[in-house]
Each structure stands twice: as C-alpha cells, then as structure tokens.
C-alpha cells in the first residue's frame, strides 16, 4: 500500500488536472481553445514571416502552436532582445541553451492580447535595431 505521503503526490496531480479541465470548460472547451491557439500562433508567425530582423527557425509545415522559436541571426542582438524584452515584462524568451535564439511559449493560458503586445514590442525593437 502507498503511504499517505506518496499518495498525496497523486492527489495533488489529480486536483490540478481537475482545475485545468474546469478552466478549459469555462473558456469554451477544446475546440474554442484550438481556435484561440491557432489565432495566437498566426499573429506571431505572420509577423515573423514578414520581419526584416526576426526569422522563424522551423519550416512552416512543422510549426508548433505552442512554442515559437525565432532568431535575429546575431547572437549579441538576440541577447539584447531578451534583456530588453525581460525589462518590458516579457519573460522566459531566451531559447534553449544549446540552440540559442529565442522561444515564445504561447500556451493555453496566454491571452491573445499577450501575443499582440509581444509582436508590438518586436516591431519596436526591429525599428530600433534593424
């Protein structure tokens, strides 16, 4: 038999899953979340596809709705972007330590407005640094 301490781990996971499922239902269900995630990804990818400074690093047919990696092509400029973005309230944009660049994680809880604000910031950064 599991000790109560060991089973508490599972209880916590089930509790958190229940909270997430209720939130998803409140937001309109999976089909609504899928539409929201597609819209968020489109906003960001459309900007990256036309940007003179930022470039997506994944082929169009392989793109994720949740994690959007991108680069400037210059490691120093990438670092400057991450630093300025963090100061502006956009956190955890630094890419994987072995790959570099940046990565925007636009999971379910990220509102569309958050992605729009990120793109606005990226446009400003591009204007100042391209």
Where do the protein language model's features map onto the residues?
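Single conserved hydrophobic/aromatic residue that forms the stacking wall/gate
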Residues: 1-6, 10
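Conserved PLP-dependent catalytic core of the aminotransferase class-I/II
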Residues: 22-57, 83
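PLP-dependent enzyme catalytic core of the Aspartate aminotransferase-like
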Residues: 80, 87, 96-130
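Short, well-ordered beta-strand elements within core beta-sheets of diverse protein domains
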Residues: 25, 69-71, 106
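Predominant activation on well-ordered alpha-helical scaffold segments within soluble catalytic domains
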Residues: 14-22, 42-45, 79-82, 116-119
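Conserved PLP-binding catalytic core of the aspartate aminotransferase-like
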Residues: 54-85
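A short linear hydrophobic-aromatic micro-motif
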Residues: 53-57, 89-95
